[in-house]
Amino acid sequence: MSSNGDTIAADVLPLGGPRFITAARAHQPWFGHRYEVAAYWIFAAYAVAVVLLATGQDVIWAAWAAPAYCLAAMALPWSRSWGVAVLTAVFAVLAPLLVLMAQGGEWAAGMTVIERSAALLIKDGTPYLPSGQLSSWLAYNPYLPAMAVFGLPAAIGLQGAPGDPRVWLVLVTVAGLAAALSLGVPHSVRTCPGCRRTLLRSIAIATACPAVALNLAVTTTDPPVLALMLLALALLNSPERIWPAAIALGVACAMKPTAWLTIPILVAMLRYRDGGRAAVKFCAGSVAVFLAITLPVLLANPIAMAQNTVLFPLGLTAHLTPAQSLTPGDLLARTGPAGHDLSVGLLLVTGMVIAVLLLRRPPRSPRAAAWWLAIGLALMFTLGPDERFGYFVYPLGLVGWLALTRPAKDDADTGGTPLESTPVAA
């Protein structure tokens, strides 16, 4: 029996050995009603700020999301938590997404790139236009080859919603979040109604939070990458799931370079927790999946891939992206070549510091690794020469996942922040 009177399911402790996830968690995580109400008010404040300060499609999202968050915060004390969360997700994601899909226009330029890349992949074996056809910034494809999969339905002739990349981006994101969060429930969701409600609530909150909801509504390509990263972290709560975690992370790395930092951090964690063999297995699996997806495209036209995925994001091509941000690194890069070099130098120094700290004080659990990753990515996106505020969906999403999956009673073995990592003797 658990502390709240619930019987622990028989499969909580498999014959192969104890789980790393605490078996006797209560159904309700620590993130209870009081914290949830506060979170919705914070979400509402963010959405109101977007209405006042942003422009374009972001304002359309905020016009739907702000009242949804306010109503959720007011209704939560008298309503079922999971029902409020689901309705909030519908009005914060689905409603503005449908409005923007019906509106169309230039805001969907990223989807045009994905659709074109899928058609090129089928026709030429590469999703990238050759240098002679790169006539404007929109001709470039900064995504890695796996991102083209979201354009394949349109490339094979599907019309309407089934062929729209935006629909598939949302579906993959929600599926990835659901899979990651389902691994943290204490019992089987098929037999435990309490776990089903908790899981549904967590999925809805994760989808409705502004970091994810805004990016889903305006359809950026980051949420599915984040979802796969979270899935890899959740899978590694069990040492028996190294291969599935490696596959999930390898696919994420083949979509965008924003997932690359996850590999060394998780390798350091596995080396400390499970030994060198497990770390090598995970690293080899992730890299093998990444190479299996990207290497054929690289061999088909290496120059085109380098121009699109390396030179264009670094601002080293004739046509520059019109997107801008006010991050310190981007502001430095705009001052000229010296500022650009300084930004790159700061980024390299940050990377070296992270590498040294990983060797000296490796994270001891997936939760600690998630803190490492959130802090590392936040520093990279702050100091990088060509970063966007939208990239902060990664550190914010990681912190949100940590909040939603934190057990009601922390076990000392579940890890913590990077400061709680265990030092390794020199």
Where are these regions (language model features)?
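Hydrophobic/aromatic side chains embedded in well-ordered alpha-helices
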Residues: I203, L216, P244, G250-V251
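Composition- and surface-driven signal marking solvent-exposed, interaction-prone regions
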Residues: V393-L396, D411
